[in-house]
């Protein structure tokens, strides 16, 4: 996922001064296992029948680039519309920003990720993320 760093994040939550995130479609390629970055993700939550989402914090392989992401897996045979929101926090409680991805019809039978902007932080500062999708709370990711 290192190639994705620098893109904006996707999230779905309270209306704050959130930046726009960036949707990236992966088809049937799992975005976590296909990445050289470290992903810390909360458990999957059901948005609708055959549609799951989870919030993640990501740290680049170089240990300095961090970002928030919301992964959506659409197992339906038709497109499904989703909007997301996520915040990225440091282990000392600092909010590094909020991102939202506008409603988009996500392709059938595939993975799509909303990424927030890459934030450069020292590798000694851990980050985690909270988020939502279509108003469903996705919980809190582990620290990475």
What function would you assign to each model-found segment?
Residues 16-144:
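Post-signal peptide N-terminal regions of Sec-secreted extracellular proteins
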Residues 1-17:
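Secretory targeting and sorting signals
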């Amino acid at each position: 996922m290192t190639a994705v760093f620098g893109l904006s994040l996707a999230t779905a939550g309270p209306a704050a001064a959130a930046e726009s995130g960036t949707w990236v479609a992966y088809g049937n390629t799992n975005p976590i296992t296909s990445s050289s970055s470290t992903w810390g993700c909360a458990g999957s939550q059901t948005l609708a029948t055959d549609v799951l989402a989870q919030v993640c914090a990501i740290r680049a392989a170089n240990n300095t680039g961090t970002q928030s992401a919301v992964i959506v897996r659409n197992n339906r045979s038709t497109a499904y519309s989703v909007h997301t929101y996520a915040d990225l926090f440091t282990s000392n409680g600092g909010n590094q920003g909020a991102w939202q991805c506008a409603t988009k019809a996500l392709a059938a039978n595939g993975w799509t990720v909303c990424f927030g902007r890459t934030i450069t932080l020292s590798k000694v500062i851990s980050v985690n993320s909270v988020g939502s999708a279509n108003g469903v709370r996705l919980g809190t990711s582990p620290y990475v």
